[in-house]
Design a protein with these regions (language model features):
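Catalytic-core regions of glycoside hydrolase
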Residues: 1-105
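Catalytic domains of carbohydrate-active enzymes that cleave complex glycans
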Residues: 1-20, 105-194
Length: 194
């Protein structure tokens, strides 16, 4: 019903949703972000690309790995963008940037939520390793996108295959047995060879 009201008011209004995958409303969503572990059907993902719609994923308190909690392996923040590249998605949604608890420099928890879930930077223009590693991952994701476009344009199948092989180890469920840092560092070495 809500989408009908929106379409009646403005047929071109772009609607976003971060939540579970719902086939019945997917065509009406310009920016659709589903929880990590769920997948867009491949034909839907490809159609969304052709329609220039944003297709992403997110994490929240329920995922132990990967995540950006203060106790998470900092490399998990970079890992998430590599995973997005593997899935051929537009990116990763981080729900909070600076929603600080009362004393963020002393205690990163907010109520029953995991420490650091509500912010990635600290007050007073202070960054943190989680944010810096997230930036690293975003930069890697963008480089992968540029390389894929270049390789496709030039018919460089070997380059495309090398990228896919580099991304193959980014699998949900591999952590913590295979630390994110191991997977990210290997991928960084390969990506930096281009």
């Amino acid at each position: 019903k809500t989408l009908k009201v929106i379409r009646k008011a403005d047929p071109d209004f772009k609607v976003s949703l971060a939540g579970n995958y719902h086939e019945e409303i997917e065509p009406d969503l310009y920016d659709y972000c589903i929880v990590i572990g769920q997948n867009f059907p491949e034909e839907v993902r490809l159609r969304r690309v052709a329609e220039n719609k944003r297709t992403n994923y997110y994490t929240c308190c329920t995922e132990a790995h990967p995540n950006t909690f203060t106790f998470s392996d900092p490399a998990e923040a970079a890992w998430m963008s590599y995973y997005s590249s593997k899935k051929h998605l537009d990116g990763y949604l981080r729900w909070a940037y600076n929603s600080w608890p009362l004393e963020p420099l002393l205690d990163s928890r907010f109520r029953s939520w995991a420490g650091g879930d509500t912010y990635l930077v600290y007050p007073g223009a202070r960054s943190c390793i989680r944010f810096e590693r997230l930036i690293e991952g975003i930069q890697a994701h963008e480089k992968i996108n540029i390389l894929r476009q270049e390789f496709e344009k030039k018919g460089n199948k070997a380059g495309l295959k090398k990228i896919e092989k580099m991304l193959a180890p980014f699998n949900l469920g591999s952590m913590p047995e295979i630390p994110a840092a191991v997977t990210v560092n290997r991928a960084n070495q390969i990506l930096n060879s281009f």
